[in-house]
């Protein structure tokens, strides 16, 4: 059996061990907007549901390892505390992968991925029409877990409206 202390591994190797150790992993396709209304769409594998009453989902945009910067998603929700968590199924795998590419800030990942943006009912960010479950959320809290590349930021979201395809 392999044994190691996490602080003895480089971030990339540790990340791979952690992700492969827990599975299958649900994927949150998070939709946000910036202060100018530009849409952003990004997948997160650090994601799950943590409470039913109140209904709480948490996902974690990590700081980039290569340059210790943060993602547009995190910057957007710091200013506009709303997010749609769209659940990814097998049919959305390829399109979701396209949203994970590094695009300049104002590039619309809905267009790049071919996914359809539809208006939400209670918040400003758009839903992904093709997603089987779409959760409109208010961001209650962001907990920064560290300052180094690879450090997560827990985004604690209260689900205020759920859309489920029949």
Model-predicted regions and their roles:
Residues 1-42, 48-166:
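Active-site-proximal mixed secondary-structure blocks
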